[in-house]
Design a protein with these regions (language model features):
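Short, glycine/polar-rich helix-capping loops at beta-to-alpha or helix-loop-helix junctions
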Residues: 49-51, 214-220
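Short, structured coil segments at secondary-structure junctions
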Residues: 58, 202-203, 224-226
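Hydrophobic beta-strand scaffold residues
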Residues: 62, 230-231
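Bateman/CBS regulatory modules and CBS-like beta-alpha motifs in cytosolic regions of diverse proteins
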Residues: 66-96, 108, 143-156, 163-187, ...
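Short, solvent-exposed cationic patches
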Residues: 117, 133-147
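A short, polar/charged loop-to-alpha-helix boundary motif
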Residues: 120-136, 241
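Divalent-cation
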Residues: 130-139, 157-217, 231-233
Length: 277
């Protein structure tokens, strides 16, 4: 789709005389022949009788009156960007911000209507909330997001399913896990067979096997029997624990209420005053 050509107004001085009006008209004609923008002549006051006579004699319409040349929002060099899906993970959103060097993304629906905004600050706040181990369940995160964030592979389960219960838990040893693993928990484990088996037997909703470790067939068989999802990731336990909460979707953190909105015709100074308050 071709980009809309920019419109530029050419205006003479206030209380215009014939020279001012004709200069604006002539310069507008010249610029339209040479430039890639659309140029329009304007006047900054009422036309006097002499100028009206000259324009009528040559059959030229007088320029439209322009009473305000204050810069408007549409005059600002605004970077256009495509909207994002509200289900996008905050990890993916952050990566997009980093790669495109922007600090705000717009979440839109199928009709391209604005649903909310997510900023770098929102993502930073989410990452600093280290104690919310139930964030994936609260936000009903899809396993697709988890797989993408952890660069993982699902060995057992449905990638289209969503996490609806449980918390993120790191399984270290059966002794520490005993009584600590709750039904539905997402348990991050190493390659220790007994840790994987205990997590499954104690009702984990999913286990994430770290360091790309191979998963024994007996573990997969027990997981299938218990309805436990099995995921592998190349990341170690520390990295996986840091990353997994960033699989939560943008919609859980975005701002969707009390958003400041301005028309493209709003004066920049008026918009600045509103934003300052």
């Amino acid at each position: 789709m071709p980009k809309t050509r920019r419109k530029v107004n050419i205006i003479g001085h206030r209380n215009p005389d014939t020279d001012s009006i004709c200069s604006a008209l002539a310069y507008t004609y010249l610029k339209n022949q040479l430039g890639d923008a659309v140029y329009e002549a304007r006047r900054a006051g009422q036309i006097n009788r002499e100028t009206a006579f000259v324009l009528k004699h040559f059959g030229v319409e007088p320029p439209r009156l322009c009473t305000d040349v204050s810069p408007q929002v549409k005059d600002i060099d605004i970077r256009e960007q495509p909207g994002i899906d509200k289900e996008m993970s905050i990890r993916a959103a952050w990566s997009m911000m980093r790669d495109t060097e922007i600090d705000t993304l717009c979440a839109i629906d199928e009709d391209k209507e604005l649903l909310g905004l997510i900023t770098v600050k929102d993502i930073a706040n989410a990452n600093m909330d280290l104690f919310d181990t139930e964030v994936l369940a609260k936000s009903k995160t899809s396993y697709k997001n988890v797989l993408s964030t952890l660069e993982g592979e699902m060995l057992l389960g449905d990638p289209d399913a969503c996490i609806t219960s449980g918390r993120i838990f790191i399984g270290t040893s059966p002794e520490i896990m005993d009584g600590a693993v709750n039904p539905g928990d997402i348990v991050l484990v190493s390659n220790r067979y007994e840790v994987q088996m205990c997590a499954i037997d104690w009702g984990a909703g999913a286990i994430v096997v770290c360091c790309g470790s191979a998963v024994p067939r007996t573990i997969l068989a027990r997981a299938q029997e218990k309805g436990c999802i099995v995921i592998t990731t190349p990341f170690d336990t520390y990295a996986a624990a840091r990353l997994i909460s960033t699989a939560a979707p943008v919609r859980h953190f975005m701002r969707s209420k009390n958003l400041l909105e301005f028309s493209v015709n709003t004066a920049v100074e008026d918009a600045r005053k509103v934003m300052a308050n």
